[in-house]
Swiss-Prot record:
Record key words, sorted: Ribonucleoprotein, Ribosomal protein
GO MF term list: structural constituent of ribosome
UniProt-listed Pfam families: Ribosomal_L34
Gene Ontology biological process terms, A to Z: translation
Entry's Gene Ontology cellular component terms: ribonucleoprotein complex; ribosome
Protein name in UniProt: Large ribosomal subunit protein bL34
Protein family: Belongs to the bacterial ribosomal protein bL34 family.
NCBIfam families for this protein: rpmH_bact (TIGR01030)
Originating species: Synechococcus sp. (strain JA-2-3B'a(2-13)) (Cyanobacteria bacterium Yellowstone B-Prime)
Length: 46
């Protein structure tokens, strides 16, 4: 039987790519700026 090798955790997901994590760094803010300019419905995972 095959095993699931990738098990994501929501806490890490939020910590790494959540809105507040993006706002914390200059490059993260650039990411948000690009996504706003593109017109994304969701700017970040959160």
């Amino acid at each position: 039987m095959t095993q699931r090798t990738l098990r994501g955790t929501n806490r890490r997901r939020i910590r790494v790519s959540g809105f507040r994590a993006r706002m914390r760094t200059a490059t993260g803010r650039q990411v948000l700026r690009r996504r706003r300019a593109k017109g994304r419905y969701r700017l970040a995972v959160s």
